[in-house]
Swiss-Prot record:
GO terms for cellular component: cytoplasm. It comes from Thermosynechococcus vestitus (strain NIES-2133 / IAM M-273 / BP-1). GO terms for molecular function: adenyl-nucleotide exchange factor activity; protein homodimerization activity; protein-folding chaperone binding; unfolded protein binding. Residues 1-70 are annotated as: Disordered. The lineage of its organism: Bacteria, Bacillati, Cyanobacteriota, Cyanophyceae, Acaryochloridales. This is Protein GrpE. Gene3D superfamilies: 3.90.20.20, Head domain of nucleotide exchange factor GrpE (2.30.22.10). Its main location: cytoplasm. NCBIfam families: PRK14140.1, PRK14143.1. GO terms for biological process: protein folding. It is found in: Cytoplasm. InterPro entries: GrpE, GrpE_coiled_coil, GrpE_head. Participates actively in the response to hyperosmotic and heat shock by preventing the aggregation of stress-denatured proteins, in association with DnaK and GrpE. It is the nucleotide exchange factor for DnaK and may function as a thermosensor. Unfolded proteins bind initially to DnaJ; upon interaction with the DnaJ-bound protein, DnaK hydrolyzes its bound ATP, resulting in the formation of a stable complex. GrpE releases ADP from DnaK; ATP binding to DnaK triggers the release of the substrate protein, thus completing the reaction cycle. Belongs to the GrpE family. Homodimer.
Length: 252
């Protein structure tokens, strides 16, 4: 049998024999660490680049930068000039359009006023035409009232009936603006009167309307029908003592 102590001794001897010296490890142990004095001197003597203040540009680089800046400035000036020209052109267009708008607005306003006047004139002409056709009816009523003499109660009743119609017609004409002229005793006006007779007389000044033969009418300030009148004329020489005025009546 083997001795246990002898076996343990042999195992320890074998392990110590297998231990090999590592040259690389020994070399690493001999390297200089950052904490060594030589390393500190090298770090202190190493130049440090100035990060905050980079190296100044060379003259060639400055010339290139100046040329680029000049080119950019020239381009900007050209763009500004083009924009100014476009602005002036647009301002001229706006001014022309504004002038056209003002002229169109004025033309439209004139057209509106003209058409309004034409419309009112047409309405007035139609109204005058219709009323003028009714005036002979009014004349007939007035002539009947003047010349008809009723003799019986029945005739008087009929007379009052159609005179009532006449009054309604006259009131209707008044409501739409028709008025009868009052020519007698006024100076003759060719715009209102139509002289159909002249009578030589000393009782009225020359040119005075002495009789209204047919009544004239107006619609507002427009003449619907001229009044037919007899006008006073100066007496002829030697006829002043003539007491019969009908002998001096002459047609116009």
């Amino acid at each position: 049998m083997h001795n246990p102590q002898s076996r343990g001794h042999n195992l320890s001897q074998a392990m110590s024999d297998q231990t090999v010296t590592n040259p690389a490890a020994e070399a690493q142990e001999g390297e200089i660490t950052p904490d060594t004095p030589d390393t500190v001197d090298k770090v202190e003597n190493t130049p440090v680049e100035n990060v905050e203040n980079p190296a100044e540009a060379t003259p060639g680089e400055e010339d290139q930068a100046s040329e680029a800046t000049s080119a950019n400035a020239a381009d900007l000036l050209e763009q500004i000039a083009a924009l100014e020209a476009a602005k002036a052109s647009l301002s001229q267009v706006v001014e022309e359009r504004n002038s056209q708008y003002i002229r169109l607005a004025a033309d439209f306003e004139n057209f509106r006023k003209r058409t309004q006047r034409e419309k009112e004139e047409l309405e007035l002409q139609i109204k005058c035409s219709v009323i003028a056709d009714l005036l002979p009816v009014v004349d007939s009523f007035e002539l009947a009232r003047t010349h008809i003499q009723t003799e019986t109660e029945a005739e008087e009743k009929i007379h009052r009936s159609y005179q009532g119609v006449y009054k309604q017609l006259v009131e209707c004409l008044k409501r739409i603006g028709v008025s009868a002229m009052q020519a007698k005793g006024k100076p003759f006006d060719p715009n209102l009167h139509e002289a159909v007779l002249r009578e030589a007389t000393n009782e009225h000044p020359e040119g005075t309307v002495i009789e209204e033969l047919k009544r004239g009418y107006m619609l507002g300030d427009r003449v619907l029908r001229h009044a037919m009148v007899k006008v006073a004329a100066p007496p002829e020489e030697g006829s002043a003592s003539n007491t019969n005025p009908t002998n001096d009546v002459t047609d116009v």
